Curated annotation (Swiss-Prot):
Catalytic activity: tRNA(Leu) + L-leucine + ATP = L-leucyl-tRNA(Leu) + AMP + diphosphate
Matching CDD domains: Anticodon_Ia_Leu_BEm (cd07958), LeuRS_core (cd00812)
UniProt keyword terms in alphabetical order: Aminoacyl-tRNA synthetase, ATP-binding, Cytoplasm, Ligase, Nucleotide-binding, Protein biosynthesis
Protein source organism: Citrobacter koseri (strain ATCC BAA-895 / CDC 4225-83 / SGSC4696)
Name listed for the protein in its UniProt record: Leucine--tRNA ligase
Motif 'KMSKS' region in this chain: 619-623
NCBIfam families tied to this protein: leuS_bact
GO molecular function terms listed in the Swiss-Prot or TrEMBL record: aminoacyl-tRNA deacylase activity; ATP binding; leucine-tRNA ligase activity
Family: Belongs to the class-I aminoacyl-tRNA synthetase family.
Domain of life: Bacteria
Protein EC: 6.1.1.4
Keyword flag Cell cycle: no
Length: 860
């Protein structure tokens, strides 16, 4: 081996070896335990960022470790290749989304290879290819036939100038990102998949996911939002239909003083015909996009419709208001308001002077003080007629029963979860495989016409989807009748909901999945990705698995046994204030910094002399220009150094602070390992290790080696605390560097230790370890080498430390053989001069001995 560690030379050679030998390609093998390690597939944006590198390094470390345990390890990679950014980039670069996407894939693939990830490249897939999305289209038509797919009108963002639908991110301050026209809300027909049909199972099966983070499971529970309540029907004077509301607090029903309906509710629409104020309010609501997340913070507004609803139990007439906090697409589009016991209802009632009627006593039994806020806690009823004195449970049941007896209420389980709207009015996505005949009949595209291929050779005008702009593309024939294809495309979450399963059989042509291969590899053993995907992707991912199970393609209930959510990567962020007061963000690479004695940044400027404001560490992002290019770091230090730093700097699930000084430290450590192996191998052949002939010092060093193996095995395998595993290897390396290397058994022990160190480091730094293993004459390639096993006998301590006390005070510590008798320990204690001086001229009256730990001599 060469004396100097030169990653730029060894890494490309090792990568070439892996390519030629197809080292990481796997097939099903029933004789081996399988392990499926999967990182979330990347969007081909053009370049890898450090968040990618962290995610994929964690996955690669786990995959390589499991492989060394002798398992059949699948670690695939692919590209989540459809999506809106490609359309914007195509317009900007005067190209089409397809070539832009494929160029990015080629570039990023080289970047992944440069980092040495052990992927099975034979399974690579790109979700934008017909070979992939054809099966998704076929599956969608099957779900339609099962009644799990339907079409209904739903609100979208509409630009009246461009006559096009806008994604949420294309609406900036209520205006179109392209032409600055005020965006409207428009109802258009869209396709939905009935995820609500699986709501209970998606909720209950969270209990099966023992190895998913509790935070993710809680987020999914809240998103599904199961609640038990009562659906109540109100008659409305002068209105042909009834109003239905759902409440989880029927105990407060006697305090309902008004109803609120969505601006889009038919009752509000009817009332607006003779009410200009209401009509203007409805118009305002129509053109205001309200996400559910904004509801809590926005100003609550409303207009009285003039209609009065009849309280089913008291017979009182209560007003019906149109309000901006009620959404037509949630529930029935109408809510019951109890301002005495709901803070939102209270604020609205206070603002508009509506009646507030308390019906729940305060905790001390007194009438509640509602002068400043509602009483939202549960309690005992009053002011509620026959229900006075009842607690929450009893009141819930009594009022629910009374409403049911009158035929105006029924108990109901509700979900916050809504069906999955999969229509997108974009071009760069998989076409939705549905057609409409001339008579309006909607049918799934026949199987012999699948896939419905998205044309890739298109011209983007940045306004209308090319398949919507081309009337010829939509024309087709079904059953001999003229038909028009659907020109909407799938939500890109569709592709990422089942890719993990297609990896098990990417070349299979008989169907969506090869059940044999899928059931060998699935479920995924560990899935690695960011927590930002907790409720969208990870919920659809679970839902799709259940759909595929019910179609007979997979036999498990859940797609992944374990979920590991890696933390974000942070970096220093700097800016200077420009002439117009704007912030100009400067890359940390270009910041010249001064630090205090504790290493804190106290002053910074850039090459142009601008005084920089340091804002601290924040998530690497384009907006703050604080991303660090992985490629630059690999070219400077080598892939192994970058990987090692990524795994050492922080626990995998915590944020990682990018510090180049830490990268330099990782590089120095690898150079030390390299140097020690070089010096050891330069001395020539090594004799066999004779454990029975080892000195006490040699035994102690060997004990450290095997204790480190045990710790690293536990840290990587069970605890997944990769940073502490690396720290343990570093600690051992410090001891090895000081160990004598002259005697025959010294060198034999060093050989055993270095073979163990190189294998333990291999998942983290595979290029260097591949080369070091060869230099140490390890058997075969390190990629096929077994993980080192700790020798229990080597870890047994020959001696132990005993604390010696005289009259309860510590006077010394002695080392004795582990099997020493009490007499031998007393004798050894007497020879310790620190102890002996307290025994001089006194009588030992009592001896308290805790074997192997404590000797207390009571003297007088």
């Amino acid at each position: 081996m060469q004396e100097q560690y030169r990653p730029e030379e060894i890494e490309s050679k090792v990568q070439q070896h892996w390519d030629e030998k197809r080292t990481f390609e796997v097939t099903e093998d029933e004789s081996k335990e399988k392990y499926y390690c999967l990182s979330m597939l990347p969007y081909p944006s053009g370049r890898l960022h450090m968040g990618h590198v962290r995610n994929y390094t964690i996955g690669d470390v786990i995959a390589r470790y499991q492989r060394m345990l002798g398992k059949n390890v699948l670690q695939p990679i692919g590209w989540d290749a459809f999506g809106l950014p490609a359309e914007g980039a195509a317009v900007k670069n005067n190209t089409a989304p397809a070539p832009w996407t494929y160029d990015n894939i080629a570039y990023m693939k080289n970047q992944l290879k440069m980092l040495g990830f052990g992927y099975d490249w034979s399974r690579e897939l790109a979700t934008c290819t017909p070979e992939y999305y054809r099966w998704e289209q076929k599956f969608f038509t099957e779900l339609y036939k099962k009644g799990l797919v339907y079409k209904k009108t739903s609100a979208v963002n509409w630009c009246p100038n461009d006559q096009t639908v806008l994604a949420n991110e294309q609406v900036i301050d209520g205006c179109c990102w392209r032409c600055d026209t005020k965006v409207e809300r428009k109802e258009i027909p869209q396709w939905f998949i009935k995820i609500t049909a699986y709501a209970d199972e998606l909720l209950n099966d969270l209990d099966k996911l023992d190895h998913w983070p509790d935070t993710v499971k809680t987020m999914q529970r809240n998103w599904i939002g199961r609640s038990e309540g009562v659906e109540i029907t109100f008659d409305v004077n002068g209105y042909d239909n009834t109003l239905t509301v759902y409440t989880t607090r029927p105990d407060t029903f006697m305090g309902a003083t008004y109803l609120a309906v969505a601006a889009g509710h038919p009752l509000a629409q009817k009332a607006a015909a003779n009410n200009p104020e209401l009509a203007a309010f409805i118009d305002e609501c129509r053109n205001t996009k309200v996400a559910e997340a904004d509801m809590a913070t926005m100003e609550k507004k409303g207009v009285d419709t003039g209609f009065k609803a009849i309280h089913p139990l008291t017979g009182e007439a209560i007003p019906v208001w149109a309000a901006n906090f009620v959404l037509m697409e949630y529930g029935t589009g109408a809510v019951m308001a109890v301002p005495g016991h709901d803070q939102r209802d209270y604020e609205f009632a206070t603002k508009y002077g509506l009646t507030i009627k308390p019906v729940i006593l305060a905790a001390d039994g007194s009438e509640p003080d509602l002068s400043e806020q509602a009483l939202t806690e549960k309690g005992v009823l009053f002011n509620s007629g026959e229900f006075n004195g009842l607690g929450f449970e009893d009141a819930f049941n009594a009022i629910a029963d009374k409403l049911a007896a009158k035929g105006v209420g029924e108990r109901k389980v509700n979900y916050r979860l809504r069906d999955w709207g999969v229509s997108r009015q974009r071009y760069w996505g998989a076409p939705i495989p549905m057609v409409t005949l001339e008579d309006g009949t909607v049918l799934p595209t026949p199987e012999d016409q699948l896939p419905v291929i998205l044309p890739e050779d298109v011209v983007m005008d940045g306004i209308t989807s090319p398949i919507k702009a081309d009337p010829e593309w939509a024309k087709t024939t079904v059953n001999g009748q003229p038909a028009l294809r659907e020109t909407d495309t799938f939500d890109t979450f569709m592709e990422s909901s089942w890719y993990y399963a297609r990896y098990t059989c990417p070349q299979y042509n008989e169907g969506m999945l090869d059940p044999e291969a899928a059931n060998y590899w699935l479920p995924v053993d560990i899935y690695i990705g960011g927590i930002e995907h907790a409720i969208m992707h990870l919920l659809y991912f679970r839902f799709f698995h259940k759909l595929m199970r019910d179609a007979g393609m997979v036999n498990s209930d859940e797609p992944a046994k374990q979920l590991l959510c890696q933390g974000m990567v942070l970096a220093d962020a700097f800016y200077y204030v420009g002439e117009n007061g704007e912030r100009n963000w400067v890359s940390p690479v270009d910041a010249i910094v001064e630090r205090d004695e504790k290493g804190r940044i106290v002053k910074a400027k850039d090459a142009a002399g601008h005084e920089l404001v340091y804002t601290g560490m924040s998530k690497m992002s384009k907006s703050k220009n604080n991303g660090i290019d992985p490629q630059v770091m690999v070219e400077r230090y080598g892939a192994d150094t970058v990987r090692l730093f990524m795994m050492f700097a922080s626990p995998a699930d915590m944020t990682l602070e990018w510090q180049e000084s830490g990268v330099e430290g990782a590089n120095r450590f690898l150079k030390r390992v390299w140097k020690l192996v070089y010096e050891h191998t330069a001395k020539g052949e090594v004799a066999a290790l004779n454990v029975d002939a080892l000195s006490e010092d040699q035994k102690a060093l060997r004990r450290d080696v095997h204790k480190t193996i045990a710790k690293v095995t536990d840290d990587i395998g069970r605890r997944q605390t990769f940073n502490t595993a690396i720290a343990a290897i570093m600690e051992l390396m410090n001891k090895l560097a000081k160990a004598p290397q002259e005697g025959e058994q010294d060198r034999a022990l060093m050989q055993e230790a270095l073979l163990a160190v190189v294998r333990m480091l291999n998942p983290f730094t595979p290029h260097a370890c591949f080369t070091l293993w060869e230099a140490l004459k390890g058997e075969g390639d390190i990629d096929n080498a077994p993980w080192p096993v700790a020798d229990d006998k080597a870890m047994v301590e020959d001696s132990t430390l005993v604390v010696v006390q005289v009259n309860g005070k510590v006077r010394g510590k002695i080392t004795v053989p582990v099997n020493a008798t009490e007499e031998q320990v007393r004798e050894r204690a007497g020879q310790e001069h620190l102890v002996a001086k307290y025994l001089d001229g006194v009588t030992v009256r009592k001896v308290i001995y805790v074997p192997g730990k404590l000797l207390n001599l009571v003297v007088g």
